[in-house]
């Protein structure tokens, strides 16, 4: 066992011992293995600047951006796992053939989606103004072995960012992003769909003409052709749900996910997380800065997103900020978040065995004394996979994962 894994096991054992008095001690029997998905010899990919993870038919597909060693170049890497993240393929440099700059970074991450043998990867490149630029699509039709250049969802060279990507059971790829095509000084939430893995895009439309300008968005698709987009609205900076019941052809703003009526003339740089259980229950984790209510909250919907439960505070008073959530089945749900502490930001995990009514005592996943942030969590065949970054002494960020069974 590596020093990293041994250290993580000891940390987890101590955390589990502290959680014995939890009203729902769901994580006490969990087996958690922490390591980096990247091999030690993947030297050029160790300094992570962003990442995304996607689950397709039980297999995991990841894309990362990284600062190349001794270079200002940002690399793009693809890797996959067929055993829930216990073992990963060697990272494949998929960006070098296209020689395009990368503006995507943590909080505005590169994105990946998969459907069968098809993969689509999208990132924000550099346009006329540094720090801004349009989206770039590349795709593979052979399980990620070879890659080709796709098209921009609008064919325009305007600034496009904070995108999310998902594939449905029919092989359609759905994309949302933010842009200011009306040039009215604020961003709108946009959508497009591709039936050929990003070679062409159709149904380009606006879902909301005014949204928060720098918070990430999250897509949720199901087998019935429903597509959901979780995003932060503008007039009140609460999270909102837009929904399509015809595979993206028509949309409506369905609901507010946590009605805090938060008025804020700025951007918190914080989106949310959304997941659907097998029985149809939708779970979400969101953050608000509303006065006397600031913090992270869990909500759930039993009527397909039309209405939501009362917000349930997550680790109240702990500084919980960026969060994600994943429903394994109709009863088991896990949340992950980062929280600011005296020694920097830490990554915490809690899970529920009763569909979100009660949660385990938060469990520390990240390394003690090292600042960790931007966690993600997805379901696997046997549990969950969590991913996050940890900032090292030289200010570079390393990528870590926790296999949770």
Predicted regions and their residues:
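Extracellular, repeat-based ectodomains that mediate carbohydrate processing or recognition
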Residues: 23-405
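C-terminal motif of bacterial Sec signal peptides marking the signal peptidase cleavage site
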Residues: 19-20
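Bacterial N-terminal signal peptides that target proteins for export
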Residues: 2-10
């Amino acid at each position: 066992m590596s020093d990293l894994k041994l250290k993580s096991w000891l940390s987890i054992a101590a955390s589990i011992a502290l959680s014995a008095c939890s009203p729902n001690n769901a994580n006490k029997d969990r087996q958690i293995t922490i390591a980096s998905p990247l091999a030690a010899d993947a030297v050029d990919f160790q300094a992570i600047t962003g990442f995304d993870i996607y689950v397709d038919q039980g297999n995991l597909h990841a894309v990362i951006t990284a600062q190349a060693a001794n270079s200002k170049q940002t690399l793009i890497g693809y890797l996959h796992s067929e055993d829930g993240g216990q073992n990963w393929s060697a990272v494949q440099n998929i960006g070098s053939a296209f020689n395009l700059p990368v503006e995507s970074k943590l909080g505005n991450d590169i994105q990946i989606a998969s459907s069968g043998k098809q993969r689509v990867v999208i990132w924000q490149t550099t346009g006329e103004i540094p720090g801004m630029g349009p989206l770039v699509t590349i795709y593979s039709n052979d399980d990620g072995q070879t890659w080709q250049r796709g098209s921009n969802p609008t064919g325009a060279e305007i600034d496009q960012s904070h995108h999310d990507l998902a594939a449905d059971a029919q092989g359609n790829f759905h994309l949302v992003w933010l842009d200011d095509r009306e040039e009215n000084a604020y961003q709108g939430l946009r959508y497009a769909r591709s039936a050929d893995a990003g070679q062409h895009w159709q149904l380009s439309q606006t879902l909301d003409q005014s949204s928060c300008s720098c918070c990430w968005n999250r897509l949720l698709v199901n087998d019935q052709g429903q597509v959901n987009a979780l995003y932060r609205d503008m007039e009140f900076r609460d999270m909102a749900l837009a929904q399509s019941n015809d595979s993206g052809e028509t949309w409506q703003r369905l609901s507010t996910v946590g009605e805090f009526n938060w008025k804020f003339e700025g951007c918190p740089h914080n989106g949310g997380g959304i997941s659907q259980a097998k029985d149809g229950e939708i779970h979400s984790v969101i953050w608000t800065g509303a006065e006397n209510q600031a913090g992270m909250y869990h909500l759930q919907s039993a009527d397909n997103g039309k209405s939501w439960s009362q917000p349930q505070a997550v680790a109240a008073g702990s500084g919980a900020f960026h969060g994600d959530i994943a429903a394994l089945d109709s009863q088991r749900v896990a949340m992950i978040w980062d929280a600011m502490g005296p020694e920097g930001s830490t990554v915490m995990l809690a899970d529920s065995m009763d569909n979100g009514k009660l949660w385990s005592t938060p469990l520390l996943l990240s390394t003690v004394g090292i600042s960790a942030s931007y966690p993600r969590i997805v379901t696997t065949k046997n549990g969950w996979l969590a991913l996050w970054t940890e900032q090292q002494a030289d200010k570079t960020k390393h990528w870590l994962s926790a296999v949770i069974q």
